[in-house]
Amino acid sequence: DRLRSRGLGDVYKRQVKNIISDNILPGDIYVRAKELHFATDVPRAVLLIRQTERTDMAALEAISNMFPDRQKDFVLSINETDLVLIKELTGPADSNKEVYEIAEEIEKKLHDDLNLKCVIGIGTTAKHLRVLADKYKEAQVAIEVGKVFDTEKSIIHYDNLGIGRLIYQLPTTLCEMFLSEVFKKNPIEALDQETLYTINKFFENNLNVSETSRKLFVHRNTLVYRLEKIKKLTGLDLREFDHAIIFKVALMVKKYLNSQNGEY
């Protein structure tokens, strides 16, 4: 009986791999699942696990052993760096908490057992088998967008990509046009590292001058002077919400263009 269930698990696994690889027509997914008595409309999470600094074949086994129910949870090897986990969810379908916890466990397991670093992209929950491929693509986008805008994060959910996702979908020509319109007076390159650091800290502290000067260990007047200097250079007063938004988006657009040109 164990052999039979293992065999069935392998058949299901092949089916799932065909779905996420787009090797099966959407209409056939339901028919094939019905033949196999494979549940089509249970909520499933799709996690893409990408090994970053080095790769190890043992990662596949390590993750597979974490999810022993081979008829419900599937760990697939996509290429030498990428593994995918399709995990049936038990909690509410719209709760990201369960999926985040799974991702954290995987990251810890790979780090503790194999000394591997990874990034994990999470798609939105698949409520039907036929949308698995879309959710897998979302997990891929989460990693790609995260690589540009959230470099310090190792677990990235598609739901939390925010403006980054929007920028990522823009043609580079449009991005370049936007930058030249925003920085009419001087190009963004005119701002030195210290100035950019000040700006980022100011954004992190919600445009609060007192709080930012405290975090930067500078006098309030020094920060005000720096903000005035930025205003002179760019024409944007970062103390004004609308100007701050334009500047924040411009910084993200610049980051995106750098990544497209291979400059991280």
Feature locations, PLM:
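Cytosolic nucleotide-utilizing catalytic cores of signal-transduction proteins
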Residues: 22-264
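Single conserved hydrophobic/aromatic residue that forms the stacking wall/gate
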Residues: 1-12
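Short amphipathic coiled-coil heptad-repeat segments
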Residues: 13-19
